[in-house]
C-alpha cells in the first residue's frame, strides 16, 4: 500500500496522510533532481516541510539510514515522525488523492 507502514510482526497497516498540519521532513541533497521534484510536489500542495541536507554531512546520512532501516539514497520523507518513503511513494500518494 502506498504511503503506509507495514509492521510484519503485527500484520497491521497504518496509513499515513499528509496534511497542511503534518510535520514533514525531507532528507535531500544538492543538485539531485528527485529531491527537487519531491520538494516542488510538496510545495505545490501547500505542504510546509523541513529540508534536511545530507550533502557533505556523513552525520545526516547516518541519521537518515538509522531512521529508514538502512536507506542511504534521497529523497527520504517522514510525516509526523513516521517513515513515508521516497519520491516514488510521494508521487503515488498524490495520484491516489486525485
Positions of predicted regions on the chain:
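Non-catalytic, surface beta->alpha helical segment in thiol-disulfide oxidoreductase systems
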Residues: 79-98
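N-terminal targeting signals for export/organelle localization
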Residues: 1-8
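Local sequence-structure signature of Cys/Sec-based thiol-disulfide redox active-site neighborhoods
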Residues: 11-50
